[in-house]
């Protein structure tokens, strides 16, 4: 049977042109009043998926 793409991963992770995986950082959605502004600034922007997780994420995306 054909493997299906994991729809949760599909929504959260984007593949760059060079093949790296980009994801948004956690802890910046809600309850931001209690968090220091330095922390929320640091959590801005995307970060890459760790090397340990890339194989698993690629499999969930249906690649390899």
Curated annotation (Swiss-Prot):
One of the Pfam families matching this protein, by short name: Ribosomal_L35p
Basic and acidic residues bias locations: 21-33
Q: Mind listing the UniProt keywords for this protein, alphabetically?
A: Ribonucleoprotein, Ribosomal protein
* InterPro entries associated with the record: Ribosomal_bL35, Ribosomal_bL35-like, Ribosomal_bL35_CS, Ribosomal_bL35_sf
Composition-biased stretches (Basic residues): 1-17
The record ties this protein, via PROSITE patterns, to: RIBOSOMAL_L35
Q: Where is this region: Disordered?
A: 1-64
Task: List the GO terms this entry assigns under cellular component, sorted alphabetically.
Answer: cytosolic large ribosomal subunit
Please give the biological process terms from Gene Ontology that the record holds: translation
* Alphabetized GO MF terms: structural constituent of ribosome
Family under the similarity heading: Belongs to the bacterial ribosomal protein bL35 family.
Record-given protein name: Large ribosomal subunit protein bL35
Which species is the source of this protein?
Answer: Corynebacterium kroppenstedtii (strain DSM 44385 / JCM 11950 / CIP 105744 / CCUG 35717)
């Amino acid at each position: 049977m054909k493997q299906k793409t994991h729809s949760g991963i599909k929504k959260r992770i984007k593949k760059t042109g060079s093949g790296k995986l980009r994801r948004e950082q956690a802890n910046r959605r809600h309850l931001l009043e209690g968090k220091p502004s330095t922390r929320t600034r640091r959590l801005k922007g995307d970060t890459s998926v760790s090397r340990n997780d890339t194989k698993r994420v690629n499999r969930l995306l249906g690649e390899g």
